[in-house]
């Protein structure tokens, strides 16, 4: 099977890296890819994820059997529908189902309509009624969410009415918003793989969304992640499956929204049980970078099962023994601003049994040097017998990634090691 991974981030590098090791995959390509995917597979730089004609040409020229869509934007724009019209199988939802991620108002309505566990919420499209509602809440902590795509940064948690109103007003100039009750508990990421009918579930992950140590600062796309999650035992996974995963897939089938691809369940484990915070309709970043090294099953075979409606005949397994921890190395100014084109002076050589360094949007200049693409530039992943060993190896690798302005959180996973 010849697979094209669409995208250029660290998630896509991890996908190319894992697929390249699959006996079910004869060639793996990345479009446009980055400096890392060009080492693990073959880049097609002419392919642009939002320029569908370039995807079609890349698929034709390289005889692609399956397209694995990495980022959310082309899914929201209907790339899977486009590929289906050409007879090319794809891992990802059609445009209608992609609204589970691209429209928080759509996904909240889906959850409420089907009686699925989620936070109570109100929807607003105008600033004045939103402000009146917020100021009537007596200063309780609330969560304001942009309805549309926001790269993980369209959320504010606060009890300050002025802050909430200002943030909401900035959203309402261009989009709708949801305001939700604030849920307390532990967050966990669950990924389901479906063939459009049946599904299997991967080991749990959790990510670290805040920019700075101690879970402080603004939200980001994610500054690190771990897999598995120490406090998620078999009993809790069984509860999540019974109360969330199975009912969600049943509701998707009932409404004609089930698809061949990935569904991410962003969950809050509250004293009253698991509640759904959000859906993504693709693998997460940085969760993918720790999940795939821990995946005992062959990813190529899982991809074939998803597009051939045979996921019930394969198993994703329970994951390999040990732990993985990922540390995102970001550029100066992230998440508020980004510097691009900085020369990377070192990327460490690592033993894959101990660590892996995934590139994000890096490029090679005319002299062969690696240049940053801004924002989150690398994910350094450590593997070990436990989280502490994985953290030690991840931070050793992260320290070896050097470029002007590079920075990273120093406490990824620490709260789970005490």
Spans of features found by a protein language model:
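Generic C-terminus detector
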Residues: 362-367, 371-418
């Amino acid at each position: 099977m010849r697979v094209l991974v669409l995208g250029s981030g660290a998630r896509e590098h991890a996908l190319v890296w894992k697929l390249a090791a699959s006996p079910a995959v004869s060639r793996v390509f990345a479009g446009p890819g980055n400096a890392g995917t060009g080492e693990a597979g073959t880049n097609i730089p002419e392919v642009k994820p939002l320029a569908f004609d370039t995807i079609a040409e890349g698929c034709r020229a390289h005889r692609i059997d399956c397209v694995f869509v990495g980022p959310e934007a082309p899914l929201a724009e209907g790339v899977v529908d486009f590929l289906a019209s050409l007879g090319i199988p794809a891992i990802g939802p059609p445009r209608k189902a992609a609204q589970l991620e691209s429209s928080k108002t759509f996904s909240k309505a889906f959850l409420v309509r089907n009686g699925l566990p989620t936070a109570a919420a109100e929807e607003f499209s105008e600033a004045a009624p939103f402000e009146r509602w917020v100021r009537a809440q007596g200063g309780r902590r609330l969560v304001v969410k942009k309805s549309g795509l926001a790269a993980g940064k369209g959320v504010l948690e606060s009890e300050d009415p002025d802050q909430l109103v200002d943030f909401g007003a900035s959203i309402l100039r261009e989009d709708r918003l949801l305001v939700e009750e604030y849920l307390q508990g532990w967050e966990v990421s669950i990924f389901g793989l479906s063939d459009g009918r049946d599904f299997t579930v991967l080991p749990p992950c959790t990510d670290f969304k805040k920019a700075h140590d101690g879970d402080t600062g603004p939200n980001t796309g994610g500054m690190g992640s771990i897999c598995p999650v120490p406090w998620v035992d078999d009993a809790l996974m069984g509860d999540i499956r019974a109360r969330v995963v199975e009912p969600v897939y049943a509701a998707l089938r009932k409404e004609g929204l089930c698809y061949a691809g990935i569904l991410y369940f962003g969950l809050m484990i509250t004293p009253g049980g698991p509640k759904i915070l959000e859906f993504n309709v693709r693998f997460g970043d940085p969760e993918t970078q720790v999940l795939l090294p821990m995946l005992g099953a062959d990813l190529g075979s899982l991809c074939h099962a998803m597009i051939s409606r045979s996921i019930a005949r394969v198993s994703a397994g329970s994951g390999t023994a040990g732990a993985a921890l990922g540390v995102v190395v970001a550029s100066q100014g992230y998440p508020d601003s980004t510097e691009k084109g900085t020369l990377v002076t070192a990327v460490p050589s690592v033993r894959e049994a101990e660590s892996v360094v995934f590139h994000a949007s890096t490029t090679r200049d005319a002299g062969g040097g690696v240049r940053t693409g801004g924002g989150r530039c690398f994910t350094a992943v450590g593997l070990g017998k436990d989280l502490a060993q994985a953290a030690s190896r991840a931070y050793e690798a992260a320290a070896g990634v050097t470029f002007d302005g590079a920075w990273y959180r120093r406490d990824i996973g620490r709260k789970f090691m005490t």
